[in-house]
Swiss-Prot record:
This is Protein-export protein SecB. One of its GO terms (biological process) is protein transport. The keyword Cytoplasm applies. The gene is secB. The keyword DNA-binding does not apply. HAMAP family: SecB. GO terms for molecular function: unfolded protein binding. One of its GO terms (cellular component) is cytoplasm. Belongs to the SecB family.
Length: 162
């Protein structure tokens, strides 16, 4: 059967995404004011979280994707704890059209990595003497769009004459 232009739609193999490896690339937890920071506080600490995603090619169809999660909990001017996790994965993407490669690497792959990174953060904070920090789910589509808008704005700023 053809699709009207003579091409056989069944001839194109479906896209494939395989997870080849997952690993902690970097993990840091700091509890700079222990043991005083472990005492009950009047107010819950303010917790700020930053999440970034990166990807780089290892081979034609293999890519490393990194999910970086940084956080800091502060009570007033005192740092209760801070952490940084860079969690990586190696993915094989086969038969993925070029225009879908970036969204696959920066949306779908981090979505697969996030539950494991979330558990590592929760356990690290708990092992540091605090209640486990359960990160909220991340909308990687919105994060991807924000990053694309920032890149477009930065390129626009570079193109403008002075």
């Amino acid at each position: 059967m053809t699709n009207g232009n003579g091409a056989n739609p069944e001839a194109a193999p479906p896209p494939q995404l395989n997870v080849l490896a997952q690993y902690i690339k970097d993990l840091s937890f700091e509890n700079p004011n222990a043991p005083q920071s472990l005492a009950p506080q009047g107010q819950p600490p303010q917790i700020n979280i930053q999440i970034n995603v990166g990807a780089n090619a290892l081979a034609d169809t293999e890519f490393e994707v990194t999910l970086t999660i940084e956080g800091k909990a502060e009570s007033g001017t005192q740092v209760m704890f801070s952490f940084e996790l860079v969690y990586g994965g190696v993915f094989r993407l086969v038969n993925v059209p070029q225009e879908h490669l970036s969204p696959m690497l920066l949306i779908e792959c981090p979505r697969l990595l996030f539950p494991f990174a979330r558990e590592i953060v929760a356990n690290s904070v708990r092992d540091g003497g605090f209640p486990p920090l359960m990160l909220d789910p991340v909308d990687f589509v919105s994060l991807y769009r924000q990053n694309m808008e920032r890149q477009a704005a930065a390129q626009g700023a570079q193109i403008r004459p002075s």
